[in-house]
Curated annotation (Swiss-Prot):
Note: The cell lines from which this sequence was cloned are revertants from mutants with no detectable enzyme activity. The phenotypic reversions are the result of overproduction of variant enzymes because of gene amplification. This variant sequence is expected to be very similar to the wild-type.
Cross-link annotation Glycyl lysine isopeptide (Lys-Gly) (interchain with G-Cter in SUMO2), location: K115
Quaternary structure (record): Homotetramer.
Protein name listed in UniProt: Hypoxanthine-guanine phosphoribosyltransferase
GO annotation terms (biological process): GMP catabolic process; GMP salvage; guanine salvage; hypoxanthine metabolic process; hypoxanthine salvage; IMP metabolic process; IMP salvage; positive regulation of dopamine metabolic process
Gene this chain is encoded by: HPRT1
One Gene Ontology term, aspect cellular component: cytoplasm
Subcellular location: Cytoplasm
Source organism (scientific name): Cricetulus griseus
Length: 218
């Protein structure tokens, strides 16, 4: 029986790292409180998740479905590691990619209203083994809605990999199959996670400051 893989749990009192210890774009220095997860740690953890995905799904042709926009960096890096495992293993699998775009945030709050604003015809997923790749699970409502949508197409298998899962009282209890980091209820940006489209160009995952929220508020 398949089990959900463990995650790196970051405690509520984790202090993070001073911005001065890392290379931060000057235009964001006043907008961030701290570096929360350095880029190198993200990459090492993603490499391990790739191994977990291959162990769980590696006997099948996989359709990797990227949730845009925030998931694109994690998606690209995860697939690079999976491709490396494919190249260096006796057992390799074909993989194809597809994309879907959802919208559920306004400023720093998940609205609970899920809008599908892009993506190809999901009927192409019928009978396939699908790996959905997401940047962050907050309340879990977005992913539950997406799963209910794709399951209408009689998938052979569906698994979810999320770089982050947030501990929050607003959670509906959903937990992905593969999780990079479990984090406190803080609004984080960087590594393609955005605040109203800003901060996607930041390599590290950081905690946004109140100054940053005010500056980039919609």
């Amino acid at each position: 029986m398949a089990t959900r893989s463990p995650s790196v749990v970051i405690s509520d009192d984790e202090p993070g790292y001073d911005l001065d210890l890392f290379c931060i774009p000057n235009h964001y220095v006043e907008d961030l409180e701290k570096v929360f997860i350095p880029h190198g740690v993200i990459m090492d953890r993603t490499e391990r998740l790739a191994r977990d995905v291959m162990k769980e799904m590696g006997g099948h042709h996989i359709v990797a479905l990227c949730v845009l926009k925030g998931g694109y960096k994690f998606f690209a890096d995860l697939l690079d590691y999976i491709k490396a495992l494919n190249r260096n293993s006796d057992r390799s699998i074909p993989m194809t990619v597809d994309f879907i775009r959802l919208k559920s945030y306004c400023n720093d709050q998940s609205t609970g209203d899920i809008k599908v604003i892009g993506g190809d015809d999901l009927s192409t997923l019928t009978g396939k083994n699908v790996l959905i790749v997401e940047d962050i699970i907050d309340t879990g409502k977005t992913m539950q809605t997406l799963l209910s949508l794709v399951k209408r197409y009689n998938l052979k298998m569906v698994k979810v990999a999320s770089l982050l899962v947030k501990r929050t009282s607003r959670s509906v209890g959903y937990r992905p199959d593969f999780v990079g980091f479990e984090i406190p209820d803080k609004f984080v940006v960087g590594y393609a996670l955005d605040y109203n489209e800003y901060f996607r160009d930041l390599n590290h995952i950081c905690v946004i400051s109140e100054t940053g929220k005010a500056k980039y508020k919609a």
